């Protein structure tokens, strides 16, 4: 997707572009997190583009990496109980128990680890000699 694509004159408030590998489960090596980085760079030129990631992988690793690549939205399937009849049961996060809370905590931790694009000196960097 290039900037030229958006020059057709269609007005939208926000345009969410999510990288998605359409497999259940999607192998982590097929996540293409670099596409999220491309959408992030595109969002710097086109302010209403919101980069994101549609997580069809198992766990939170790819979603955390998407945050590091600039994703501002993560889409993840959720479930209540066993839904083995569905095609996404293996990748869905269970809403009961701690699984969903842990997934969200991982995302929030990734956001903190990424920090901002502004270089700052943290208290942890001040050495006491």
Residue positions per predicted region:
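Catalytic cores and adjacent flexible loops of soluble metabolic enzymes
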Residues: 1-129
């Amino acid at each position: 997707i290039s900037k030229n694509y958006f020059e057709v004159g269609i007005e939208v408030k926000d345009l969410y572009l999510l990288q998605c590998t359409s497999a259940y489960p999607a192998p982590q090596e097929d996540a293409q997190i670099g596409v999220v980085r491309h959408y992030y760079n595109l969002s710097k030129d086109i302010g209403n583009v919101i980069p994101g990631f549609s997580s069809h992988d198992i766990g939170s690793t790819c979603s955390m990496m998407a945050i590091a690549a600039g994703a501002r939205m993560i889409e993840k399937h959720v479930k209540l109980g066993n839904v083995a009849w569905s095609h996404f049961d293996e990748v869905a996060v269970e809403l009961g128990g701690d699984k969903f809370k842990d997934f969200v905590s991982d995302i929030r931790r990734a956001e903190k680890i990424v920090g901002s694009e502004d270089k700052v000196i943290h208290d942890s960097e001040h050495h006491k000699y």
